[in-house]
Design a protein with these regions (language model features):
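Alpha-helical secondary-structure segments
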Residues: 47-49, 132-138, 162-168, 233, ...
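Detector for C-terminal structural segments
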Residues: 5, 10-26, 37-42, 46-47, ...
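Aromatic- and charge-enriched surface segment that lines or borders ligand/interaction sites
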Residues: 104-147, 160-168, 326-328
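Ligand-site clamp/hinge motif
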Residues: 120, 248-298, 444-446, 451
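Gly/Pro-rich hinge or "lid" segments in bacterial periplasmic/extracellular proteins
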Residues: 92-93, 185-257, 264, 387, ...
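N-terminal lobe/hinge region of extracytoplasmic solute-binding protein
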Residues: 49-110, 141, 229
């Protein structure tokens, strides 16, 4: 199957999304109502924040999370999703091991070509039905509808009994374990019909790009259930959902309900501007937004600690290479990399939490020493600020300059628009500075902020000139996931789900100094094999190809500046030096994990 699937947030993955109405009121949050018995009779509440769209734009189709989800699902693109529909396990980034949730164990048999997951017994859904292996099969077949990358490895699915799932594969994939264990499991009662339709296509040898697959994909994008059947310790209190906040209430029969310590989780809706005021007023206990550097001292004065976990990703400059032939010329992209001062962009966006990308290989600088040999690192071009090189490359590509202004190879005035999610304070500041730097160089770029839910959709449809979207991935340390974000999520393979080509960089028959390559194949191979040394070779090929071609231009690597309010309503946030702080906040979130452990608790008294 060709690798065609849809985003995040990230990651996404990788980032924050919302559509906050112009009239949102965030300065006076409503007091949450009680939703549980509590130890002392009074309900306890944790106050978090995450951007979402209320109905009708927002919905409860939690399918194919976290790697190929449907856009605008309420809380579906963030860490609190795991408290509603838990995955099999969460990954401990420092310890490099799994902490099981729904799963009891797992085993990868390379010679037999199977990944077997044993499910904890006696798990139940909020509708009263048992959670079984059939729900896992449904989940994976629904991922096929969303063109999830896992289906480049999966060759079959089996459920020998109610608590055993077997995933079959051909080439042992290093990353399949992550795709399987991190999948948020869906209820067959809610998604069984969709899973059956996908299974029929799989068994017939079909794809999502033809016949029944195309119709199924179209139908599924329109599936917007009124609620979600959950298996985790919390469920939505649907009556509380407004444009400003919602409440999650304890699901007493869900997995982890015996360990989580809060009766309610109050989630305030909003992007950075709205949530900043709520942090300053002490209404939020923890938030992961990209806060403006100027906010940090007021937060600390209000009693907050600033947590700075690595995010392992950040914003990149996307160029519409399908629409503008000058952007399709690698010399132009290299010139842009040389002319942009990435350190300044990161400093303006996030101060010490915005670190300029150094190696420009498509994945976090934190992992370069783990995956690339000294020989490979010696081949990397770091694209350090060099306006002379930028000028030379543009001239070589046919650009000309009249006075202080550049013209494209076609003789047109070099004038573009860069779009970015307006409500992301860090990306907004970065986008404006990118426009200023281009202007100082003689290329006119107009900055335009968009609704942050619409911005990635516009990129997928090709309705942009320049744009800020994510590079890298918070989903797992393995570089494969970063390459998927860089090359597939807003490019031809996955943008297809929105009917476009994204930034329009072809992945097949790509010319490099090493010869003609198939980047889609290279990315897939970067996740194959169980021998680490073999994986390093594949990762090196992908890293060098990215570094030479710069399909997108990474700008800075983001570190969290997450305010945590210890000792008022909540206690148990990790301290500096705690290895759990190496967990990516948008993937295996340390606060969510500590909630499952019962280590984030209400303040007594």
């Amino acid at each position: 199957m060709s690798m065609n699937w849809t985003r995040r947030d990230l990651l996404k993955t990788v980032g924050l999304t919302t559509a906050v109405g112009a009239g949102m009121v965030a300065c006076a949050p409503a007091e949450p109502e009680g939703g549980g018995s509590g130890e002392g009779g009074a309900a306890t509440a944790f106050h978090g924040a995450w951007p979402y769209m209320a109905a009708p734009e927002g919905h409860f189709n939690f399918a194919a999370q976290p790697y190929a989800g449907v856009p605008t699902v309420i809380l579906g693109d963030g860490p609190y999703r795991d408290l509603l529909v838990p995955p099999s396990a969460l990954w401990l980034w420092k310890d490099k091991k799994w902490e099981y949730l729904l799963a009891e164990s797992h085993e990868l048999d390379a010679s037999g070509g199977t990944l077997t997951v044993k499910i904890k017994p006696d798990l139940t859904w909020s509708d009263g039905s048992a959670l079984t292996s059939q729900d896992f099969l449904t989940t994976f077949y629904v991922q096929f509808i969303q063109r999830a990358a896992s289906w480049d490895f999966i060759t079959g699915l089996e459920a020998p009994d109610d608590t055993t799932v077997v995933v079959n594969f051909e080439n042992p994939p290093a990353v399949l374990e992550r795709y399987v264990l991190k999948s948020n499991i869906l209820s067959t009662a809610q998604y069984g019909e969709w899973g059956d339709r996908a299974k029929a296509i799989v068994e017939a040898g079909g794809s999502m790009d033809e016949g029944d697959g195309e119709k199924l994909g179209t139908d599924f994008q329109a599936f917007k259930p009124e609620n979600v059947i959950v298996s985790g310790p919390y469920d939505f209190d649907y009556d509380t959902i407004t444009n400003t906040q919602l409440t999650l209430v304890r699901n007493k029969t869900g997995y982890g309900a015996d360990k989580v310590t809060f009766d309610n989780l109050v989630m305030y809706n909003g992007e950075t501007t709205e949530i900043t005021s709520l942090v300053q007023s002490g209404d939020v206990d923890y938030a992961t937004h990209g806060f403006a550097p100027a906010s940090e001292k007021p937060f600390e004065s209000a009693g907050y600690t600033i947590l700075r976990p690595p995010v392992y990703s950040g914003p990149a400059l996307y160029l519409n290479q399908d629409r503008f032939p000058e952007f399709a010329d690698v010399r132009t992209r290299k010139a842009f990399a040389y002319l942009l001062d990435r350190a300044t962009i990161g400093q303006i966006a996030l101060a010490e939490s915005g670190k300029a990308v150094v190696n420009m290989v498509g994945f976090s600088d934190n992992f370069v020493d783990d995956w690339l040999t000294d020989e490979v690192k010696g081949k990397i071009e770091k694209y350090e600020l060099d306006l002379k090189k930028a000028t030379s490359l543009l001239e070589e590509a046919g650009w000309t300059k009249e006075g202080d202004a550049w013209k494209t190879p076609e003789g047109k005035a070099a004038a573009y628009e860069i779009q970015f999610p307006q409500t992301y304070a860090d990306w907004s500041a970065a986008g404006k500075n990118v426009a200023e730097q281009f202007g100082e160089f003689g290329i006119s770029v107009t900055a335009r902020g968009l609704d942050d839910k619409q911005a990635p959709i516009d990129v997928d449809k090709g309705d942009f000139e320049m744009a800020m979207q994510a590079w890298g991935s918070s989903t797992h340390p393995h570089p494969h996931f970063s390459f998927v974000q860089d090359l597939f999520v807003h490019n031809i393979p996955i943008a297809k789900n929105q009917g476009g080509k994204g930034y329009g960089f072809p992945l097949q028959d790509v010319e490099t100094s090493a010869g003609t390559v198939d980047l889609e194949k290279i990315v897939t191979e970067s996740g194959e094999g169980l021998d680490v040394e073999d994986q390093k070779k594949n990762v090196s090929v992908a890293a060098l190809a990215f570094n030479e071609l710069l399909p997108i231009i990474p700008l800075f690597e983001r570190y969290g500046n997450n305010p945590a309010l210890e000792g008022v309503r909540v206690q148990g946030f990790p301290k500096d030096g705690d290895p759990i702080l190496e967990n990516a906040p948008y993937a295996d979130n340390f606060v969510v994990l500590k909630m499952f452990r019962g280590e984030i608790t209400p303040v007594e008294g």
